[in-house]
Amino acid sequence: MSDVAAPEFRTLDEFEYGSVEQVTPLIRRVIANNPSKFTYHGTGTYLVGHGDVVVIDPGPNLDSHRDALAAALAGERVRAILVTHCHADHSPLAAWMRAEFDAPTFAYGPHPPPDPAMEPPPDASEDDDGASGEPVRIEESTDFDFAPDQAVVDGDVVVSGGGLTMRAVHTPGHTSNHTCWTLDEESTLFSGDHVMGWSTTVVSPPDGDMSAYIDSLRKVAGRGDAVLWPTHGPQRDDASSYVSALVDHRLAREAAVLAQVRAGRTTAPEIVEVLYAGVRAELHKPAARSVWGHLVKLVDDGELVVVGGDLPTLGARFIAT
């Protein structure tokens, strides 16, 4: 294992799938039964407000989660559905919820089309079965069917009145369309997958962009939110210091990746074998994707080039300039 220290992560130890947990006076959470190496215990869908409700990240297409949300929202009106990004553990149930509650969807935009030249081939090892027994294609699967009713830009006020004020905060990096959502009344940022309390975030090219991700982390660190509520894992009530630590961690990881290339390890998997030697083997594939993100950034920064002048794909070889 490298000497790159990780920030202090936290666990979410007490919860029940499908139950409604009142986590603050204005926020409820329902956790989907889709645990995996990407999703931790599962997708946390947030219900904001009472009576007139805003839903954040409806979650995956699981019957059990749909039924839990239907029960949680019985007798209430959904005024808006906010989606952080278009991975399959976040947005698919938006279509059902939109039809069921006649509520508009908001997001930065649809996911851009795939880039066949850069996309790695499908890997069956990235499929997991949730503890529910329902097959789940984990986060790296993309919901290309989702398109919002209303596309937002950074700073848009999407909900106002009824005791709720919510704004869009565009945070590209994990995906190009990733957007966090604020709740002004509780000085809260719903951070999606941009910041997670239990782990670092996978930043996988081509749509994931490490340079944009680090810039977005700095943006969030400077906002002054009191609490972060990620879609996976526990809240962080040390928002600014924790996100600043994530920036430091990413920069240290980048330096370690560059050092490994200079030492003769020229591919993402070779680098992972060293930098993640103490990490469980099943996490090496997602780790390789973030290492790939660092390699692409280092190419863009002029620190590395691709052997043979090829595209900086997951299988490419890199050398220092």
Regions found by a protein language model. Give the residues of each.
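Histidine-centered divalent metal-coordination motifs
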Residues: 84-90, 174, 232, 294
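Active-site HxH/HxHxD metal-binding segment of metal-dependent hydrolases
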Residues: 41, 60-163, 187
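Residue-level signal for inorganic ion chemistry
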Residues: 26, 69, 232, 257, ...
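Metallo-beta-lactamase
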Residues: 53-55, 60-62, 140-150, 164-254
